[in-house]
Regions:
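Core alpha-helical transmembrane segments of integral membrane proteins
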Residues: 154, 158-177, 182-193
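Short, small-residue-biased leader/transition segments that mark boundaries at the very start
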Residues: 1-5
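Phosphate-/polyanion-interacting regions in eukaryotic proteins
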Residues: 18, 43-137, 161, 167, ...
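Long, compositionally biased intrinsically disordered regions
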Residues: 348-626
């Protein structure tokens, strides 16, 4: 019906091409260099275009069917793609409802291009505020309607080769799609700073993929949101699931999960189902059940941040596991250990045993805390998720304080000589209870001392008044309970205030809520200090404005003793990895001496291990600082 061509247009590099509908063509002047060094002139060859616009210097060739209703940018390479079309009006995956946590519905999260882990958490978990959910749905629907179009878009610098069908998909700049089977109703939010790769045999429908993601090798997904820098490969399958920044999923299966930042599952036999996770490391054969064969798959579970599941672990939902816990064995009695962070949850004799605080002295916990920031693969300057990596924070310390009270209460009610204590469908041994109190106490001393030292560091003061001025809180927020919004650690009151603002203001926007999360993330340490000041009367018996230099000295000494004690526990735990048992299988055909030499060649010497050196230096530095 109509064809628009740009200045300097030449048809010399258009062959075996059919046009219909409204067509707009750029110029074809440059050569494109392909992998292996092959150079091709840009142009159109063996392709049928209907209602399409093509930018400058793109190469499109060998399209068996056709391309319809697409705006294609400049410098694109599209080759051997069966079919690319937009059919009817589409929001390109925006406002797709994902039945997360409960497969039968009730916690649906409508996904959109800029969905953050924090907003998704509120939509999924705050169903006790139907007014809030209704307002957020309205805002997301309005955003999605703004994306609606009869034309799909393929951005600049996109490569699509050897691919099957692409239907109703928005494709951002510099995306690479290679050997993909089928993509339907979605958005791929690639950009120059953080390109997206969609690889061989991927099938996806009703999805949104964020910048920097890598999806390849037979992944099958339906009704999913994939966050920034996520990595899904090796036949992984998922439906009705949300994956946020830096998740890594391979081989296994996910059904209706809320995978907060750094959720990692790598093994074929692992099934994550109907659970909320973040900073998770799932061992091989890790499984859960959300179905008791009565009213359907209606149960859910929460594994708080930083937890690990060992090989063949199993949890029968509903259950709730505390932050930074280790889960070993099968647990079918619905434990709630959220009040006991850094614990071991171990099955023995068909009973769930809890070892409070045991993970505080585990070298693996500290390694995790160090590696998470280093493994942040997000290169997009516009980061959607707010991520706090701190092991010790008001969120975990408040739970330890509650844990100390709970453990001491168990001793009083059941007697100090009791062999075992019952707690939330778990059993705590007497020795574990007493060690748990000691470990939690050390951790609180470490956190409180850290906070005070950081507050005073680099700030000279000449008298007591100047000391108190420096210690005075500078943020009005921070007192009371803190919560973990899937990566963002924040005062509960601040979230409540934001919810009230959203509900009470009919003109509130998604951008304002994004800004709120970012502001809370920036203000974390100021709010943390406000919280520290609020618990000083309980922990030290004095308010912050009553602390004397002698009190500061005492606090720093307690901090130093706690830090060094915990570091020595880590040192001893690391030494176990170099024990005689760890050497079994080394020097397979040699003598004992050859076994030890083989071990040292492969694993190195204990004193030269990088982590061991770090712990030793940490002990020296903190001792000197103290």
């Amino acid at each position: 019906r109509q064809m628009c061509i740009r200045d300097r247009f030449s048809p010399d590099h258009i062959t075996h091409t059919r046009f219909s509908g409204e067509i707009e063509l750029g110029i074809f002047e440059k050569e494109m260099e392909l992998p292996g060094g092959l150079k091709k002139k840009t142009g159109l060859h063996h392709v049928t275009l209907h209602n399409c616009s093509i930018g400058n210097n793109s190469l499109i060739e060998n399209i068996p069917n056709y391309i319809a209703n697409y705006q294609i940018g400049s410098d694109c390479f599209i080759q051997n793609v069966n079919l690319i079309l937009t059919e009817g009006e589409s929001c390109f995956g925006n406002n797709t409802e994902v039945s997360v946590l409960n497969e039968t519905g009730g916690r649906e999260v409508p996904i959109y291009n800029r969905l953050s882990a924090q907003l998704a958490y509120i939509i999924a978990m705050y169903r006790h505020r139907p007014d809030l959910i209704a307002r957020l749905r309205e805002m997301i629907e309005a955003y999605s309607l703004a994306q609606k179009s009869c034309y799909g878009k393929i951005g600049n610098g996109v490569h699509i080769v050897n691919t099957g069908t692409i239907r109703n998909v928005y494709i951002g700049d510099y995306c690479q799609i290679d050997g993909t089977s089928r993509l339907e109703n979605g958005s791929i939010n690639s950009n120059r700073e953080a390109p997206v790769y969609i690889g061989p045999n991927v099938t996806a429908e009703d999805f949104i993929v964020s910048s920097g993601a890598h999806i390849s090798d037979g992944v099958v997904m339906s009704r999913c949101f994939i966050g920034q820098a996520c990595h899904l490969t090796h036949l992984f399958s998922a439906h009705d699931s949300l994956f946020f920044s830096n998740c890594q999923s391979e081989n296994g299966e996910a059904c209706a999960i809320f995978a907060g930042p750094y959720t990692v599952t790598m093994h074929k036999s692992s099934l994550l189902i109907a659970g909320m996770f973040s900073f998770l490391n799932a061992g091989s054969g890790s499984n859960q059940s959300n179905h008791m064969y009565k009213l359907g798959p209606i149960h859910q579970g929460v594994v708080e941040r930083g937890s690990k599941t060992t090989s063949d672990s199993y949890i029968l939902w509903p259950a709730k596991v505390g932050a930074f816990s280790l889960i070993m064995g099968r647990h079918v009695n619905h434990p709630d250990t959220s009040g006991m962070p850094f614990s071991y949850l171990i099955e023995h004799g068909n009973r769930s045993y809890l070892v409070p605080g045991a993970n505080l002295k585990s070298v693996g916990t500290i390694r995790d805390a160090q590696k998470w920031p280093k493994r942040d693969k997000r290169t997009d300057p516009d980061k959607l998720d707010c991520i706090n990596f701190n092991l010790l924070s008001p969120y975990t310390i408040q739970k330890m304080l509650q844990g100390i009270d709970t453990l001491q209460g168990l001793k009083q009610t059941s007697g100090e000589t009791s062999e075992c204590y019952s707690f939330q469908s778990t059993t705590i041994k007497n020795s574990s209870l007493n060690k748990g109190i000691d470990l939690y106490t050390l951790a609180v001393h470490k956190f409180m001392g850290n906070s005070i030292i950081k507050r005073l560091e680099g700030a000279p003061f000449a008298n007591l008044n100047e000391l108190h001025d420096r210690l005075k809180p500078t943020d009005s927020l921070g007192e009371g309970e803190w919560i973990d919004l899937s990566g963002l650690i924040v005062p509960k009151q601040a979230v409540k205030d934001e919810i009230d603002r959203i509900v009470g203001n009919p003109d509130s926007t998604l951008e304002e809520t994004e800004s709120f999360f970012q502001a809370m993330h920036r203000r974390y340490y100021d709010m943390e200090w406000t919280w520290v000041c609020s618990i000083m009367p309980r922990w030290y018996g004095k308010t912050v404005d009553r602390l004397s230099p002698g009190d500061i000295i005492r606090i720093v000494r307690q901090w130093n003793e706690a830090v060094v004690s915990l570091d020595r526990m880590l040192y001893d735990d690391a030494r176990k990895e170099f024990s005689m048992i760890s050497r079994i299988g080394f020097g397979v055909d040699g003598s004992t001496r050859q076994r030890d030499f083989d071990f040292e060649q492969v694993r190195g010497e204990f004193e030269n291990d990088a982590f061991v050196k770090m712990v030793c230096k940490h002990i020296e530095d903190k001792t000197a600082l103290g």
